[in-house]
């Protein structure tokens, strides 16, 4: 991973410099856009963009239909991780320990009722850049996941939110606990947590 980072460092610096002009133009245009929104909706309450700051959003766990005859379920499982495994692509290499746990179905208390291991889920929460790592709570205030991305259709959400298409991608807390407990063997950390089932 370190060698990979070093190999792209120069190119990343070049791209960052090349994007600087675009970013400046976008920031100026966005300022005018927000000014226009505030003027147009001056009688209504306005909410700020997250722009890498704290923000509260809400939604529901939900799949979506990005186009005709295509439906993405709201839940992914470890089955999907194994289906995507590719030993020639570092992003899709599955560690032997995780494979062994999967083959043995050794998911402990973290598995779904049907015996599968949950990995991630999608929700209608409206997120933006800087929201990765944000806690995701249920209606009882219990941690159920950690936001880490948004779907491809959600990238334009900084301009306009489209509830039928945009989804936050959230790692299921049961998968995180499974990795801590079964994969990493660090179950002692769980003693510091209050787990609710």
Predicted regions and their residues:
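Terminal presequence/propeptide segments associated with secretion/organelle targeting
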Residues: 1-197
């Amino acid at each position: 991973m370190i060698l990979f980072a070093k190999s792209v460092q120069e190119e990343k610096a070049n791209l960052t410099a090349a994007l600087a002009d675009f970013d400046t133009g976008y920031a100026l245009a966005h300022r005018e856009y927000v000014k226009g929104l505030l003027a147009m909706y001056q009688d209504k309450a306005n909410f700020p963009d997250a722009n890498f700051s704290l923000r509260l959003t809400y939604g529901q766990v939900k799949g979506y239909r990005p186009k005709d005859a295509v439906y993405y379920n709201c839940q992914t499982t470890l089955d999907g991780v194994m289906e995507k495994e590719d030993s020639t692509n570092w992003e899709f290499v599955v560690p032997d320990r995780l494979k062994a746990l999967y083959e043995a179905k050794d998911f402990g208390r973290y598995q779904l009722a049907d015996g599968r291991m949950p990995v991630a889920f999608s929700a209608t929460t409206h997120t933006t850049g800087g929201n990765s790592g944000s806690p995701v709570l249920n209606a009882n205030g219990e941690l159920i996941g950690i936001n880490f991305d948004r779907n491809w259709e959600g990238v334009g959400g900084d301009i306009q939110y489209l509830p039928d298409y945009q989804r936050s991608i959230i790692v299921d807390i049961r998968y995180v606990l499974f990795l801590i407990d079964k994969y990493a063997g660090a179950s002692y950390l769980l003693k510091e947590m209050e787990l609710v089932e």
